[in-house]
């Protein structure tokens, strides 16, 4: 099978043809580690985790290099550390650890390489020096700026007019810039800043601009040309636009990334997520609410990755009900490992990662189990269900673990025995009272014809 991806650069869905099938290269913008990741950040990670799984299936793990960076030098980091009264290293270490915990919770595979910006300052300086030498960058008032007007096809990714692009974002104006749109490659240290956030350079003590960081790390591990660059749609301009400009100007014959993939925005109850609106939801918030990671992952895959996605309680509850349905479908069935995943399921994912269609196909297997007339039919559908769900990072537990985790089985069994004894004594009121008590605790009882009682979580 062949995979098709929507390329933001060409505005077309294209057949993915890597430069080298034995060395498929993908770079994805990772987190800026100044605060705990929110649910919107997580959508991006889950989307490119799915793409990574697809690429590995086609080209094998040894042939796919997935680079996702950690931005650990940034103005937001300096401000946040100062507000908390802790060192920058303490903050970035803490938030990076939290990010990794969150991604494990969401069943995301680790990237092949996860470089930190602070460990690649030398590469950034090397690229900036190239840009100065070629005339694409200039020094002004201890800053180094990139001259946007000298970049060929600067607007090719956003497909917008230059003046319109800069109306949509805040441009830091400066009398030292040649043009208001020029962006910073290197900025000087401020007297009161943490020394750990500044580095020696030919232009004095300072730190890199945001955009040069990704250009440097992608070049270090993937070279001047690579296959896929991913990130959120909010990064198209200015971040990805500026990456392309500086990288193509720094390296002759560089096309930078061939395929640009961008995921859509995530809202909360129909509104943009922001701390001022009080609807800022971190992954840690969901973990603290005891919402299982699989539920959140399924929710994040329910909409096509390029479409907007709205977070709300009903959407999370619907994802939980879907997983409950799938786990209930495979209960007490002997699952067989299958060598080849169903072609319609794989085709849905190979068609620009159509995860909603893939989820529908999994759901159809669950329905088929409940309507099956023999064990062989049940086993066939259950084996396909679990294989497909596993492929997209779901159903990582047994049905027993899913329904009974964090449940006191002894407590429930004791109440069931009390109820059975009450029924023997014809104390129907007590029997109903026990059933209702467990029902209020989301435990459903089912009386069997042989006189026994089984239970499950709602």
Curated annotation (Swiss-Prot):
Extent of motif 'HIGH' region: 31-41
Annotated localization: Cytoplasm
Broad class of where this protein is predominantly found: cytoplasm
UniProt superkingdom: Bacteria
Cofactor(s) the record lists: Zn(2+)
Cofactor, how bound (note): Binds 1 zinc ion per subunit.
Enzyme Commission number(s) from the entry: 6.1.1.16
Catalytic reactions of this protein: tRNA(Cys) + L-cysteine + ATP = L-cysteinyl-tRNA(Cys) + AMP + diphosphate
Residue window of motif 'KMSKS' region: 272-276
Any one Gene Ontology molecular-function term assigned to this protein's record: zinc ion binding
Residue sites binding ATP per the record: 275
Example of a GO cellular component annotation carried by this entry: cytosol
Pfam families from the UniProt entry: tRNA-synt_1e
CDD domains assigned to the protein according to its UniProt record, in alphabetical order: CysRS_core
Keywords: Aminoacyl-tRNA synthetase, ATP-binding, Cytoplasm, Ligase, Metal-binding, Nucleotide-binding, Protein biosynthesis, Zinc
Binding site for Zn(2+): 29, 214, 239, 243
GO biological process: cysteinyl-tRNA aminoacylation
Subunit structure: Monomer.
Similarity section: Belongs to the class-I aminoacyl-tRNA synthetase family.
Protein name: Cysteine--tRNA ligase
């Amino acid at each position: 099978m062949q995979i098709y991806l929507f390329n933001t650069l060409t505005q077309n869905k294209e057949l993915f043809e890597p430069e080298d099938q034995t060395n498929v290269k993908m770079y994805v913008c990772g987190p800026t580690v100044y605060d705990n990741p929110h649910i919107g950040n997580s959508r991006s990670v889950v989307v490119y985790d799915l793409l990574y799984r697809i690429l590995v299936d086609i080209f094998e793990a040894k042939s796919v290099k997935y680079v996702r960076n950690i931005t650990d030098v940034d103005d937001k980091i300096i401000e946040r550390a100062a507000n908390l009264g802790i060192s920058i290293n303490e903050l970035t270490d803490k938030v990076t650890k939290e990010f990794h915990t969150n991604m494990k919770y969401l069943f995301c595979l680790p990237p092949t390489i996860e470089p930190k910006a602070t460990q690649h300052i030398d590469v950034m300086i090397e690229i900036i020096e190239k840009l100065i030498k070629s005339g694409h960058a200039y020094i002004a008032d201890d800053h180094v700026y990139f001259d946007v007007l000298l970049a060929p096809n600067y607007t090719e990714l956003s497909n917008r007019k230059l003046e319109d692009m800069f109306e949509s974002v805040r441009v830091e104006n400066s009398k030292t810039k040649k043009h208001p749109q020029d962006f910073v490659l290197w900025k000087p240290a401020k007297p009161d800043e943490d020394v750990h956030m500044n580095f020696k350079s030919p232009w004095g003590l300072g730190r890199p601009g945001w955009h040069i960081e990704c250009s440097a790390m992608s070049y270090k591990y993937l070279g001047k040309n690579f296959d896929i660059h991913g990130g959120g749609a909010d990064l198209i301009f200015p971040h990805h636009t500026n990456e392309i400009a500086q990288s193509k100007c720094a390296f002759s014959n560089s096309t930078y990334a061939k395929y640009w993939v961008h995921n859509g925005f995530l809202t909360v109850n129909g509104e943009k997520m922001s701390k001022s609106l009080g609807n800022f939801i971190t992954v840690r918030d969901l973990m603290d609410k005891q919402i299982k990671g699989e539920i959140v992952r399924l929710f994040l895959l329910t909409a096509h990755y390029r479409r907007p996605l709205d977070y709300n309680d009903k959407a999370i509850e619907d994802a939980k009900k879907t997983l409950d349905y799938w786990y209930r479908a495979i209960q007490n069935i002997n699952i067989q490992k299958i060598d080849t995943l169903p072609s319609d399921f794989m085709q849905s994912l190979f068609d620009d990662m159509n995860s909603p269609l893939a989820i529908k196909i999994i759901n159809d297997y669950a329905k088929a189990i409940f309507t099956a007339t023999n064990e062989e039919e049940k086993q066939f559908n259950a084996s396909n269900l679990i294989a497909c769900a596993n492929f997209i990072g779901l159903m990582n537990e047994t049905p027993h673990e899913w329904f009974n985790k964090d449940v006191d089985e002894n407590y429930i069994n004791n109440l069931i025995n009390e109820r059975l004894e009450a029924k023997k004594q014809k104390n129907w009121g007590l029997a109903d009272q026990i059933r209702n008590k467990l029902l209020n605790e989301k435990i459903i009882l089912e009386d069997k014809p042989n006189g026994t009682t089984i239970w499950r979580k709602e």
